[in-house]
């Protein structure tokens, strides 16, 4: 999923 990749590249985005 895109969100998973976003969290991987941007930990801040995960939160």
Swiss-Prot record:
Its main location: secreted. Strongly inhibits juvenile hormone biosynthesis in vitro by the corpora allata from fifth-stadium larvae and adult females. It comes from Manduca sexta (Tobacco hawkmoth). It comes from the Eukaryota. This is Allatostatin. The modification Pyrrolidone carboxylic acid is found at residue 1. Belongs to the allatostatin family. One of its GO terms (molecular function) is neuropeptide hormone activity. GO terms for cellular component: extracellular region. Keywords: Neuropeptide, Pyrrolidone carboxylic acid, Secreted. One of its GO terms (biological process) is negative regulation of juvenile hormone biosynthetic process. It is found in: Secreted. The lineage of its organism: Eukaryota, Metazoa, Ecdysozoa, Arthropoda, Hexapoda.
